[in-house]
Structure formats: C-alpha cells, structure tokens
Design a protein with these regions (language model features):
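GST-like domain detector, emphasizing the conserved glutathione-binding G-site
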Residues: 1-110
Length: 110
C-alpha cells in the first residue's frame, strides 16, 4: 500500500492525519504539485484525474478521495475507531463531516 501525498495540500493532509492517528505504517510518496508532478505520465497512470490524495494497492487498485480512503482505512484498521463506535456516533460523525465538506470546504473553494 502506498499513499501519494502533498505536504502543502489540504485534502491529503486530512488523510495523513487519519493515518497518523490510526498508527498505520504506509509508504508515503510526496507529489510536488507546485512543479506539476501530478501531471506527469507516471502519475497519470496512478491517477488519471491528476489529484492527491491517492492510496494505491499492490494489485493496482487505487482510492482517490479523502472520504473513500478514510472509509477503507477505518474498515481495514478498526482497532482505533476514528469514525465512531456506535451507530449513533457513526451517524453524527458522518453528518458533521458532510456539513464541514459542503458548508465549509466548498465555501472556501468559491
């Protein structure tokens, strides 16, 4: 498993924090967005959308969204639950995440 990151970008930072909080040992590859490394032919093979974060697997599969990566890691490494323990907690956390992403992050992008 490899995590394609960019230290200065906000979306991969969220995944990087998630990985650290769960104490997951994963190979991290920094992608230099300022110099256009995400547009290179090599990176386009990994993610044709040319974005980070990316979590890639030995079989060639990839996850390319913070939500997808977090969901996968939460299911794969449940010992440190970050997305809630009970159904109520999971629902409240999902609701808060949606609110942050839609009302907070989307507003900042405008």
């Amino acid at each position: 498993m490899k995590f394609y990151d960019c230290k200065t970008a906000p979306s991969p930072r969220r995944v990087r924090i998630f990985i650290a909080e769960k104490n997951i040992d994963v190979e991290t590859i920094d992608i230099d967005l300022r110099n256009g490394e995400q547009l290179s032919p090599e990176f386009k093979k990994i993610n044709p959308n040319c974005t980070v974060p990316v979590l890639s697997f030995d079989n060639g599969d990839t996850l390319t969204s913070t939500a997808g990566i977090r969901s996968y890691l939460e299911a794969k490494y449940p010992d440190i639950p970050l997305m809630g323990r009970t159904d109520d907690e999971k629902g409240k956390i999902a609701d808060l995440q949606w609110r942050i992403e839609m009302e907070g992050l989307m507003a900042m992008s405008e």
